[in-house]
Amino acid sequence: MLAKISSSAKRFVHRSLVVRGNAATFPLSFSFCRRRAFSGKTSYDYREVLRTGLSDIELDDAIGLFGVMAQSRPFPSIIEFSKLLSAIAKMNKFDLVISFGEKMEILGISHNLYTYNILINCFCRCSRLSLALALLGKMMKLGYEPDIVTLNSLLNGFCHGNRISDAVALVDQMVEMGYKPDTVTFTTLIHGLFLHNKASEAVALIDRMVQRGCQPDLVTYGAVVNGLCKRGDTDLALNLLNKMEAAKIEANVVIYSTVIDSLCKYRHEDDALNLFTEMENKGVRPNVITYSSLISCLCNYGRWSDASRLLSDMIERKINPNLVTFSALIDAFVKKGKLVKAEKLYEEMIKRSIDPNIFTYSSLINGFCMLDRLGEAKQMLELMIRKDCLPNVVTYNTLINGFCKAKRVDKGMELFREMSQRGLVGNTVTYTTLIHGFFQARDCDNAQMVFKQMVSVGVHPNILTYNILLDGLCKNGKLAKAMVVFEYLQRSTMEPDIYTYNIMIEGMCKAGKWKMGGIYFVASALKE
């Protein structure tokens, strides 16, 4: 069997290297790695450090420890070096592990299968798959047979190296070589298949695992559920939950929360609530993510009473709401006209040391503007800037709209200039709001100036912009200019709507041009 595995493995390595044009051997001295200066004399005993564990070791201490170990005579065992390399790899410092592997070879310290596996994994994790394969070839020449850990590392390298067909072939070869793919193998391949938009193959792999005598575990099912939900395939995800139940595998809160969040995103809030009830009936306790997804979803769809009920339930269970929960509820209360409740939630956030985000601040600014509390809205803008939460165009648009509605378009223009100084570019909503604001203030010249500026900077007016401009011109006795704008609109790719025609008909009639108004009326009727 060993001979069979060895010959099959060598064929695999040879094909992977030669077909791809990679180097067929691994450099003896790891000469491709950068060299480091290692810390030398220190007073502590490396054995004591290794004995107490490396789970919390800092990077600088790990580098210093390697320096001490490299200068110790006799050398520490390869097992002790492996412990350190593994700890550094867990910090995602893959290049450093490879560099230390080079140093060990220079010092004459021979690697074993465990260190080879660590190094192969590091090459794969930093997208140097050709060198991982070369190192595999070298270790096999030295008499080390790859184990399932080696091959799983290579599989991960193929999946993340845009070689998904090679990854699938590797799993088949593993069986031919006498290896039994485990849940890590299949879960890695599932991640890779989703990474390359092969969802149906990933789902089919669950059945394939069972056929090969490898029962998928919670992690494997979780990987498939997560991949399906990211694509919006919630029906398939729900079917998979049923498969798990049939296989006597209990879904955990992470899997349920993933599906609930996906159902919420695709407007299946009732299905999400039903699944929430189902998970509770099965004894799975929802967490803050589960609640936040549902509360945010229900608020978005105007189901505030359901959202409030869930919040009460959440607090009763001593599950602390997070930023998402608070922000969703604040926005919901603002839209419902209950600013006092929104403010209380904001105060509760601050008490709990939860920093508001741009969405939270923008919602509150909108609430203040709706009630004409513009001073407080401006103060909230200044507060968010002081807190290094920089406003975006939506935030400024909300405040500009508030001032324009209050017939304080001059303040709106100040805010427009302020946002421009911050490097933010006004959009169609910004300019349309200002045009409307100037017309409300009976400042026809500045309204036209803003429109011209809008066009000159490449911001495209929409039909609402044109309707506001035409209405403002007609009501301010500038019918001739309105006619020019209307004719331009007709020549453009944008279609006038019923409101456009009504504005022009009313303008014509007010100016005593009844005949022309009648023509526009007929045109609007034909339009309908």
From Swiss-Prot:
Name where the PPR repeats lie.
Answer: 77-111, 112-146, 147-181, 182-216, 217-251, 252-286, 287-321, 322-356, 357-391, 392-426, 427-461, 462-496, 497-528
Keywords (A to Z) from UniProt: Mitochondrion, Repeat, Transit peptide
Which segment is the transit peptide?
1-20
Q: What is the disulfide pattern of this chain?
A: none
Q: Where in the cell is it found?
A: Mitochondrion
Where does the sequence pass through the membrane?
Answer: none
Extract the Pfam families matched here: PPR_2
Q: Which GO terms describe its cellular component?
A: mitochondrion
Q: Known SUPFAM superfamilies for this protein?
A: HCP-like
Q: Which family does it belong to?
A: Belongs to the PPR family. P subfamily.
Task: Write the protein's name.
Answer: Pentatricopeptide repeat-containing protein At1g62914, mitochondrial
Query: What organism does the record attribute this protein to?
Result: Arabidopsis thaliana
